């Protein structure tokens, strides 16, 4: 992938029709399965990301897809962050932070009062957890269809 270090980042809604975006979704799923035990992965595949109530965005730098993230409307003015993944060529460049801020802004604009997320446990998840906690997310109870296990954790942000 050709990176463009001086190009500005642009975040836009994505319909997952771009093969590069599809590849990043696959990379995300592979990463989740590689770092979590069977039955403990709740990441959405492409069909799950295309369902009603789910909005997907990509962060682009130049012509490259630098990251992906989604917001799932759970009803009751609550949203769930799904499928946050930065392409390996763009790590530590603020991609995930920009996507997270975008989701928070959109959630507020849609009248949501809370954002929640489920993520894994262990060293592979520490960078993401640090990002969420820096932004004000706090540990909390399981939500929606999730059940607490030793392999997952839940974070929430009141908007």
Stretches found by the model and what they are:
Residues 117-128, 146-150:
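Conserved beta-strand-loop-alpha-helix junction that forms the acyl-donor binding cleft
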Residues 54, 150-155:
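Short hydrophobic/aromatic beta-strand or adjacent loop that forms the aromatic wall/cage
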Residues 107-120:
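Conserved GNAT acetyl-CoA-binding A-motif
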Residues 86, 92-105, 130-134:
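Conserved acetyl-CoA-binding loop-helix of GNAT-fold acetyltransferases
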Residues 1-10:
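Short, low-complexity, intrinsically disordered N-terminal peptides in bacterial proteins
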Residues 9-78, 82, 87, 100-101, ...:
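Acetyl-CoA-dependent GNAT
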């Amino acid at each position: 992938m050709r990176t463009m270090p001086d190009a500005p980042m642009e975040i836009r809604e994505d319909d997952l029709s771009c093969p590069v975006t599809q590849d990043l979704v696959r990379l995300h799923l592979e990463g989740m399965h590689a770092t979590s035990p069977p039955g403990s992965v709740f990441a959405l595949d492409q069909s799950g990301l295309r369902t009603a109530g789910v909005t997907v965005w990509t962060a682009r730098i130049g012509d490259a897809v630098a990251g992906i993230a989604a917001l799932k409307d759970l009803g009751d003015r609550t949203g769930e962050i799904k499928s946050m993944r930065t392409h390996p060529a763009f790590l530590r460049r603020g991609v995930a932070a920009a996507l997270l801020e975008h989701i928070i802004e959109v959630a507020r604009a849609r009248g949501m009062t809370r954002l929640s997320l489920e993520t894994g446990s262990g060293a592979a998840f520490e960078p993401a957890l640090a990002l969420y906690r820096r932004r004000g997310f706090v540990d909390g109870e399981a939500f929606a269809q999730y059940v607490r296990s030793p392999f997952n954790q839940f974070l929430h942000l009141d908007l």
